[in-house]
Amino acid sequence: MTPPGRLYLLRVRSAPVLLLLGLLLGLPPGAQGFPGVGISPSAARTAYQHPQKHFIQGTLKPAAHLIGDPSIQNSLRWRANTDRAFLRHGFSLSNNSLLVPTSGLYFVYSQVVFSGEGCFPKATPTPLYLAHEVQLFSSQYPFHVPLLSAQKSVCPGPQGPWVRSVYQGAVFLLTQGDQLSTHTDGISHLLLSPSSVFFGAFAL
């Protein structure tokens, strides 16, 4: 049995047609057209003639992608609606936290990149610890609960410039009103650019 949410690529007269499993499952079981699939001839024609429209209509789910604000020092502040960052279909950003619009399964992800000129003092460098965490605050819990967490350390090590990246992502069952936020140690070493530091989630 194919897992829910998988994207199908069908070929009709050698033209690729994208159909979402969610659209197929939403049709009546007895619909005529493709046996065992449950899609009517009219729906199939729509998908064939207007695949982009058909695909977009089937993916109007909550999604958010945030990037770090490089204008703010000593703090990681998230921003949307700029440089490929966005909030769609119910997601909102409040007090540097993403507010979950509806209950369901979400893929939550984040990446940060740290960099430095070298280890100091050079004679006996002190270890530098870096960490990034995605946290959940919910009405079910009176405190922030870690969802994703990663740590790295640099120094002692090579005396030249260094770079460390951390990417995390996983699927979680979230509830409407949940708040997603991040906590970072080593903020002064963040390499703030839209492609290096980001945070987001989307419904499955």
From Swiss-Prot:
PANTHER family: LYMPHOTOXIN-ALPHA (PTHR11471:SF31), TUMOR NECROSIS FACTOR FAMILY MEMBER (PTHR11471). It comes from Canis lupus familiaris (Dog). Residues 1-33 form the signal peptide. GO terms for molecular function: cytokine activity; tumor necrosis factor receptor binding. One of its GO terms (cellular component) is extracellular space. Residues 62-204 form the THD domain. This is Lymphotoxin-alpha. One of its GO terms (biological process) is cell surface receptor signaling pathway. Keywords: Cytokine, Disulfide bond, Glycoprotein, Membrane, Secreted, Signal. Homotrimer, and heterotrimer of either two LTB and one LTA subunits or (less prevalent) two LTA and one LTB subunits. Interacts with TNFRSF14. Its main location: secreted. It holds the Pfam family TNF. Disulfide bonds join C119-C155. Belongs to the tumor necrosis factor family. Cytokine that in its homotrimeric form binds to TNFRSF1A/TNFR1, TNFRSF1B/TNFBR and TNFRSF14/HVEM. In its heterotrimeric form with LTB binds to TNFRSF3/LTBR. Lymphotoxin is produced by lymphocytes and is cytotoxic for a wide range of tumor cells in vitro and in vivo. SMART domains: TNF (SM00207). Glycans are attached at N95. It is found in: Secreted; Membrane.
